Amino acid sequence: MAKSLTAAELRGYSVKELTEKLKEAKEELFNLRFQAATGQLDNNSRLRIVKREIARIYTVLREHELGIMPLAAEESADKAKEAAE
């Protein structure tokens, strides 16, 4: 992941896309930790950034699960159903 995503940007994704982004972020964190352990990591701050991205993704998924903040992809599907009726 080249750039950090904000929670507002993440809310625009579907649950499937969020789980895919979560998987990618976890893989990146694993690789960064491995590089840090072997002394090959150049940018230590990237570890912190990736951890925060993972936390943001979990937060958005939990908001959706609790119904606090629906995902944008879901809102557009609901509006389409209402318009069809």
UniProtKB/Swiss-Prot annotation:
GO terms for cellular component: cytosolic large ribosomal subunit. One of its GO terms (biological process) is translation. Keywords: Ribonucleoprotein, Ribosomal protein. InterPro entries: Ribosomal_protein_uL29, Ribosomal_uL29, Ribosomal_uL29_CS, Ribosomal_uL29_sf. One of its GO terms (molecular function) is structural constituent of ribosome. Belongs to the universal ribosomal protein uL29 family. PANTHER family: 60S RIBOSOMAL PROTEIN L35/50S RIBOSOMAL PROTEIN L29 (PTHR10916), LARGE RIBOSOMAL SUBUNIT PROTEIN UL29C (PTHR10916:SF0). This is Large ribosomal subunit protein uL29. It comes from Thermobifida fusca (strain YX). The lineage of its organism: Bacteria, Bacillati, Actinomycetota, Actinomycetes, Streptosporangiales.
